[in-house]
Every structure is written in C-alpha cells, then in structure tokens.
Amino acid sequence: MHQSIDTAIGLNLLHANQAGADHNRAHFDEWGITCLNLMSSPGAGKTVLLEKTLAALQSELKMAVIEGDMTTELDADRLRQYGSPVIAINTGRSCHLDAKMVAGGIHRLQEDYNPKEFDLVLVENVGNLVCPAEFEVGEHSKVALLSVTEGEDKPLKYPVMFQEADCLLITKTDLIPHLDIDLEKLAANVRSMNPHVTIIPVSAKTGEGLDTWFSWVKSQVKVPMIVSI
C-alpha cells in the first residue's frame, strides 16, 4: 500500500515537472534560445568545461549560464569571470535542478536582460549520476559527462543518464596513461543502450576534443531565418 502511494506521488511529481519543463522550453523557443543541460557525477569536469566553452565561444554566441549547486556560489563565481550572465541556484537538500527552479532562474535573467538577445543557455546541473536525468528543466539537448577515472562500467550501473544523453563527453582523457581503462569498451557500453549518442573524448588540460565539442555546441544553436524582401 505504502509503495503504491509513493509511486503515485513520484509519478505526479514527474508529471508536474514535465509540464514546467515544457513551459520553460516554450519560452526558450519563443526567444530563439537553445538550452543545453549538463549532467554528471561530482568532479567530472562540468565547470571547467563551461569555462573553456565560455572563453572560446563568447565572440560567436551570446550565452548565459544557470548554475546549480546544493550550496555556495563557488562555481558560479568562477564562471562569472568570463563576462556572461551566471544565475546561481542553490538546491539545498535536492540532488538535482527541476523545472520550477530553472523557471526562477529564467525570470531572474529577464530582470536584467532581454532574453531575445541570447543564443544559448547552458545549465550546469547538480553533480549526481541519477536524479538530474529524470527531471527535465526545459532543455533541448542533454549532455552527460563521464570522467575516465569513473570506469567503463559506470553507464551500465547508472543507465538512465546515458540513455537520455544526446551527447556524452568522456573527460580527463589526459589521465588515461595512468589508468586501466578501455575507451572502446566504455563507448560500446554506452552505445548498447543509446546507439545514436554523440561521444566526444575531451581533456580540458591538453585541449583534446574541445574543438569538436565547440562545433557540436554551435550545431545545436538555433540559427534565425533571414527572410529576403
């Protein structure tokens, strides 16, 4: 009985969140913004990837960041150095951002900026391999990060995030010489559950794969149609 009640409550929460996510996405679509949701376990490299992305693409794209952490604005402060607006959201005990939280972030962005000026909103979700994948926030694409130190079996143990991802970044590849890891096996494990995912090995330290990542990001951004009169 209790299990049935818990299941019903969980489904209601997911349904309500999905409605909120659809509402957020409708706003993004109205404004011509692409939203990417970055997800990973803690320490996989989301923040440093965003630093590299903001630095590399700021002359080409107008970007904003919604930065999720349980507490502090440490990561948000790091990202603010690159000049793009960064909205920090502290989730408290929650292990993920949800659509309502991100809606609040959108409203805060609207207070100081015209959202139609932006091309891209990058959401850095709370570090967790499970919860963020189950709660959409209004994104157009999900980006998962997995560091080589986590092993090639992680996608099999925590499948939902890797099943949902549109792009997987295998991070910290500069550490491979010091580890016993098989990248081909890792990629095969991911493709066994998500055959169409884009997989990009990257190293923020050496720069490996970053240009490929930047190209993928730009390929996702909505390009306004120019109508000739």
Swiss-Prot record:
One GO term of the biological process aspect: protein maturation
- What are the recorded GO MF terms, alphabetically? GTP binding; GTPase activity; nickel cation binding; zinc ion binding
What is the documented disruption phenotype for this protein? Disruption of the gene has no effect on hydrogenase activity or urease activity.
- Domain of life from the UniProt record: Bacteria
Residues engaged in binding Ni(2+): 95-96, 131
Q: According to the UniProt entry, where is the signal peptide?
A: none
Looking up Pfam families in the UniProt record yields:
cobW (PF02492)
> NCBIfam families from the xrefs?
hypB
Give the protein name, as stated in the record. Guanidine hydrolase-activating protein B
